[in-house]
Amino acid sequence: HHAGLVTAAEDLGGLSVSVQNAGVVLPGFSWEIPLDRWQLQIDVNYWGVVHGVRAALVAMTRRGTGHVVAVSSGAGLVAMPGLAPYVSSKHAVVGLMESVRHELARAAPGVRASVVCPGNIDTPIAEHSLAVAGVADEGLSAPSQSVADAVRAGVAEGASPQTVANSILDALGSGRFWVLPQPEVAIGALDRVQRILDGRDP
């Protein structure tokens, strides 16, 4: 499908903006989550973004202009319990886009890259993820289930999706790489760096 996107972009006068947003989350302790649910989260959250970003970059680097945006998560900067596959995949998206940014600076400076790291956003991701996995519930132990329930509660209390959309539009105007719609994500990332510097545990 890379070739198809490139051909379509050329037929339409070129691809100017590409926003990659893919996510499923199936919480639980890492040793309780079945491997097929690990695989699903990595496939959608990481490989889905890789395919989209790579196809967009092929088209954009040919023209020398464009802006590719990938939506990661606050979980791409700060880890939390009960979300190991999701956290791993979202960290991978951040690493991908940082590498892409370095590459574009050297090979195609007219093409911009941004990574979006939202905190909790009020979406039906939890319900949709169960449907994609084809299960009614995670089938977790009680301690693991309590963490999963807390994840869902946090999502339900999250910000509006419009918050993320507005931040992406701002980034397209400014060319900013790091896009953190909610300040608590930056605070969490700063705390992580300080813990690394101090040699303290997460």
Model region roles, listed by residue range:
Residues 8-18, 26:
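A glycine-rich helix->loop->beta "capping" turn
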Residues 29-30, 34-39:
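Substrate-binding pocket helix/loop in short-chain dehydrogenase/reductase
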Residues 33, 79-87:
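Active-site loop-to-helix junction immediately N-terminal to the catalytic Tyr of the SDR YXXXK motif
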Residues 73:
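Residue(s) in the substrate-gating loop at a strand-loop-helix junction
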